């Protein structure tokens, strides 16, 4: 069995490990209430299915979108951020649309990282925060975030005490 050097560098995928534990517990007869990854357990509402069907049948949607995403969607995203968080984001230079957070973060990691760059990632965080940079060849340092110190203080201390200085620091909302 061939192993690839970038894959070998990855830590175990926490969601796969948790899924395996749930499967073992269920096989042993345990009644599991799953608070894991958000896989839908209800059908998609009919009005959403109808709108999707309508869009799929429209020949204008049978093409690739612009590489940064549909302009109207980018404007709607920036308006949301302005209304929700009070920030001014430019839809032309500060907003892109991706298929999801994993794709976006993996592409960002590859775009801004050179092999050997130091990247600081808070722990806990979403697995792609580490995985994307590891695949890009970076040296990732996991920074434990303790409730008594707080996320920003932990990252600030880590930056101050890092040699070499990090190329990037992942700043995420701790509960995603």
Question: Where in the sequence are the language-model features?
Answer:
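A general structural motif
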Residues: 32, 92, 116, 164-166
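Short glycine-rich anion-binding loops that position phosphate/pyrophosphate groups of nucleotides
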Residues: 40, 102, 126, 173-176
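A short helix-loop-beta submotif of the ANL/AMP-binding
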Residues: 135-140
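Conserved PLP-anchoring active-site segment centered on the Schiff-base-forming lysine
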Residues: 111-127, 132-133
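Conserved beta-strand elements of the Class I
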Residues: 96, 118-120, 141
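Active-site phosphate-binding strand-loop segment of PLP-dependent enzymes
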Residues: 141, 146-176
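N-terminal small-domain helix-loop-helix segment of the aminotransferase-like
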Residues: 3-4, 8-99, 107
């Amino acid at each position: 069995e061939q192993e690839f050097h970038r894959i070998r560098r990855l830590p175990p995928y926490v969601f796969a490990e948790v899924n395996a534990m749930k499967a073992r517990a269920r096989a042993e007869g345990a009644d599991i209430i799953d608070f894991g990854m958000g896989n839908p357990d209800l059908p998609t509402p009919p009005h959403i299915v109808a709108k999707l069907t309508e869009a799929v049948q429209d020949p204008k949607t049978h093409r690739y979108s612009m590489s940064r995403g549909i302009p109207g969607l980018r404007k709607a995203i920036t308006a949301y951020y302005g209304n929700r968080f009070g920030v001014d984001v430019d839809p032309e230079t500060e907003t892109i649309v991706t298929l999801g957070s994993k794709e976006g973060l993996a592409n960002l990691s590859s775009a801004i990282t050179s092999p050997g760059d130091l990247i600081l990632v808070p722990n806990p965080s979403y697995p792609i925060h580490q995985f994307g940079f590891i695949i890009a060849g970076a040296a990732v340092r996991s920074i434990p975030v303790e409730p008594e110190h707080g996320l920003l203080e932990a990252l600030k201390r880590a930056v101050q005490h890092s040699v070499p200085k990090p190329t990037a620091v992942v700043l995420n909302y701790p509960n995603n």
